[in-house]
Amino acid sequence: MIQEQTMLTVADNSGARRVMCIKVLGGSHRRYAGVGDIIKITIKEAIPRGKVKKGDVLKAVVVRTKKGVRRPDGSVVRFDGNACVLLNNNSEQPIGTRIFGPVTRELRTEKFMKIISLAPEVL
C-alpha cells in the first residue's frame, strides 16, 4: 500500500536511489497503490552521472510492497521494503536496463513484460 509521501527504493539502474510518491495515478481520489500500479514520483536521492537527477518528476511502477499481495489460492507474498521501477513519462517503458531483486507475477501484463524479462526472479 503506497500513498502520497511514501518513500520507496528504486529497483533498477536508472541512477535514482530513493524516491517519494507524489500521486497515485488511476482515479480521481485514489488513495493507495499496490503491486503493478503506476504512481508519480519525485527523486529524493540519486547517484552522480545517473540517467536521472534529484528533483526529476517521473512515473514509476510499484514492484514490491511491505503490505504484500494476496493470491487467489490464499497465499500472501510480502517483502521487506517498498520498491519501484522508474518509467519514461511518455512511453511508460523502464528507464533502467537492469532490475534488482525479485518482482511478483502480478506484473505479468502486456504493459510490464519488459520488467518481467529483465528481473532476476519472478515470484
UniProtKB/Swiss-Prot annotation:
User: Per the record's keyword annotation, is Ribosomal protein included, yes or no?
Assistant: yes
Record flagged with keyword RNA-binding: yes
InterPro entries linked: Ribosomal_uL14 (IPR000218), Ribosomal_uL14_bac-type (IPR005745), Ribosomal_uL14_CS (IPR019972), Ribosomal_uL14_sf (IPR036853)
UniProt GO cellular component terms: cytosolic large ribosomal subunit
Q: Which UniProt keywords apply?
A: Ribonucleoprotein, Ribosomal protein, RNA-binding, rRNA-binding
Top-level taxon of the source organism? Bacteria
What Pfam families does the entry give?
Answer: Ribosomal_L14
MF (Gene Ontology): large ribosomal subunit rRNA binding; structural constituent of ribosome
- GO terms of biological process kind: translation
State the family named in the UniProt similarity comment for this chain. Belongs to the universal ribosomal protein uL14 family.
Looking up HAMAP family in the UniProt record yields: Ribosomal_uL14 (MF_01367)
PANTHER family assigned to the protein according to its UniProt record, in alphabetical order: 50S/60S RIBOSOMAL PROTEIN L14/L23, LARGE RIBOSOMAL SUBUNIT PROTEIN UL14M
Purpose: Binds to 23S rRNA. Forms part of two intersubunit bridges in the 70S ribosome.
On subunit structure and binding partners, the annotation says:
Part of the 50S ribosomal subunit. Forms a cluster with proteins L3 and L19. In the 70S ribosome, L14 and L19 interact and together make contacts with the 16S rRNA in bridges B5 and B8.
This protein's name: Large ribosomal subunit protein uL14
Species name for this entry?
Answer: Sodalis glossinidius (strain morsitans)
Which lineage ranks, top first, belong to the organism behind this chain? Bacteria, Pseudomonadati, Pseudomonadota, Gammaproteobacteria, Enterobacterales
